Amino acid sequence: MKTTTTKHRGDAAEDAALDYLRDAGLLLLARNYRTPGRGGGEIDLIMRDPRGSSGGTLVFVEVRQRSAGTHGGAGGSITGMKQRRIVFAAQHYLSRLRVVPPCRFDVVLVEEKITWLQGAFDAG
């Protein structure tokens, strides 16, 4: 039952992050995008930020939620391995596009309040 509870909390955090980003003007393109096969990656939200260059910026969003601030809180749970998996999934997503737009990797922390970290990490 704990898995179900954890999944429900994760889904609720993603819903809250999605609402927050939509209110900021971003547009949802995909949710829970997964690469095929084992060992791939997943991206919680893929959005487009229409501000800036023509066509906007493609935004790959990782949503993290922790009820307790221990162990670095929600932000402390984004390890280098997790970042590499997100980048791998983003590369897979981009390989399907004819034209690759500007991109960035954001993180939304859902704790007592929502914190949006734009450009939280890069693909390098």
Spell out what each predicted region is:
Residues R96-G124:
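Domain-level recognition of nuclease-like catalytic cores that cleave nucleotide substrates
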Residues M1-Y33:
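Acidic-basic catalytic patches of nuclease active cores, encompassing PD-(D/E)XK
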Residues I43-G69, I86:
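Conserved catalytic cores of phosphodiester-cleaving nucleases, focusing on short active-site segments
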Residues T6-G10, E14, G39, I78-Q83:
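Short, conserved glycine- and acidic-residue-centered signature motifs
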Residues G40, G56-F60, P102, I114:
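Structural motif
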Residues L27-G55, G124:
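Active-site metal-binding core of divalent-cation-utilizing nuclease and nuclease-like domains
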